[in-house]
Regions:
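N-terminal interaction/assembly modules
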Residues: 1-132, 136-165
């Protein structure tokens, strides 16, 4: 199973948990029972291959992070979706953005550009072109507003430390 497929499963799992109002970890336990996963494979080719341990860990970690940081992520979406309230954004688009934001903020093994690109590519399978562009814009603004200033501050601190030595 590729990371892209694992990411799409994580987005679907996060979406399902959020829609049901359930803890993502409990939803994942049900989702990844071999019997249930097999029934999903009958309906959607995305589920044809059961994830290996590495991909299963990635999916569980990402969905857990989305669940744990839901309030913060929703706030970030509204902040960078200027003029849009979360209620006006499709639930699928919001789920895609939450997962990408979690990868950017909390998963060091995923480069920011890769998280955005993967989110945009996955959105193309679910959303209209205008919404795909919207997702790209929100995530780009998010990185410029939240992540890059932190990286610049860290670089300045490192330079000051080197200068003092």
């Amino acid at each position: 199973m590729t990371r892209t497929v694992a990411r799409e499963i994580a987005i679907q799992l996060s979406f399902a948990a959020q829609l049901a109002g359930d803890d993502a970890r409990e939803t994942a336990d049900t989702f990844f029972s071999r019997e249930y996963f097999a029934t999903l494979a009958e309906e959607d080719p995305l589920f044809l291959e059961y994830p290996d341990e590495k991909q299963l860990d990635y999916i569980r970690r990402l969905t857990g992070l989305v669940y744990d940081h839901m309030y913060e992520l929703n706030h970030m979406i509204e902040k960078y979706a200027r003029g849009w309230r979360l209620e006006r954004i499709s639930r699928v688009a919001a789920a895609i953005m939450r997962c990408a934001m979690c990868e950017i903020l909390y998963m060091d093994d995923v480069p920011n550009a890769a998280a955005i690109n993967e989110a945009v590519e996955l959105a193309k399978g679910y959303e209209e072109p205008e919404t795909v562009a919207f997702i790209n814009g929100v995530l780009g603004s998010f990185v410029r507003g939240e992540v890059e200033p932190e990286a610049e501050a860290e670089e300045e601190t490192e330079e000051e430390t080197k200068t003092e030595e």
